Amino acid sequence: MAGAKSTRTERPSAKGERVRLASVIAPFRADATEDTKPSGRAGKTGRARTTQHQVIPSGAKKARLPEKLFPQLATLVSAAPTTGDWIYEVKFDGYRILTRIKHGKPALFTRRGHDWSSKMPALVEQLRTLGIKSAWLDGEIVVMGKDGVPSFNALQNAFDRARTADIQYFLFDVPFFEGYDLRQVPLRDRRRLLKTLLETRATDKIRFSDDFAGDGTSIFAAACRMKLEGVIAKRADAPYVSRRSKTWLKLKCTQRQEFVIVGFTDRKGERTAPGIGSLLLGVHDDAGKLVFAGSVGTGWSTETAADLKRRLVALEVKHPPFADATKPKSGRWSRRSAVPERWVKPVLVAEISFSEWTPDGQLRHASFEGLRMDKPAQSITRERALEPELAGRKPLRR
């Protein structure tokens, strides 16, 4: 994948970018055409080694496969970068999953290192057919909705209903491969290796996450028009680092993030009523203290509402789960429910979309997207988008 020049004289049209983005989900969409192909940039590997019919790029080092690997995470930014050599991938609406293949046996791990292999036996078996003896692979699992676009709710339902055979696995990186540590190899060359591997061995459930080179603003706009979650911008020359970095940037089409569920209200204010009226939400501040962030009262089905109530009643406590043990107050910019609020142990995490934050730190026009079983409540903080020019000034903590 040859490096793209940072100065471009032609700006691709939003329509053209939508056509190219359509190829990412072409196997699932009826409106995709054969000529919708992503960039597929090939990198110069210099002196390289060959193993298992795969070219190991220059910069790789012989190394033992680690038992655990913390993933590289992206920094939220407000706009696409305007300088540097960047590639763009679809931001899939799913769960981050890393695969360790040891002695030919795959195991699936969440970003926090929990082994989910038993939850997705069909995917484990398909990974086994790749014929890899030793590797760490990085990607995202998704389930496609009826419109052919990744659906977080459909993914959650797949786990809740034990229908994980519907899951697709989009791979986008390979930090370790067949006895080599590739983390210091430039991204473009790691992805070239992964793409070559999957061109001949990909299955109907395991796919390469294609990238797009070009004007990031147009690519992002096209992704939003296609109702995708957003895009990920990655520096083509960057190494793989096990922390949140500023060589991977995420741009979201809507405001959306995880929140800790701190309580709920009953539907119509009746404790015996099925379902719930609203969820009460919180995030951790810079000091690590849990603070109130508002509520959400829409976005769930009758079935989901009943499931949420069963989970929450089992976690109920007498007092609000905040550091000062006081009930949060209504702010000027938000309204609190008139019905009694019931508090719970702050262990469940929900994905919430919303229009904006109010000046007093609460959500407006929020909608429930689903539970996040892959992220611990202690890690949930308010996401703040950086300007892209500021993203590279100093490193972020993990």
Where are the language model's segments positioned?
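Catalytic cores of nucleic-acid ligases and guanylyltransferases
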Residues: 1-398
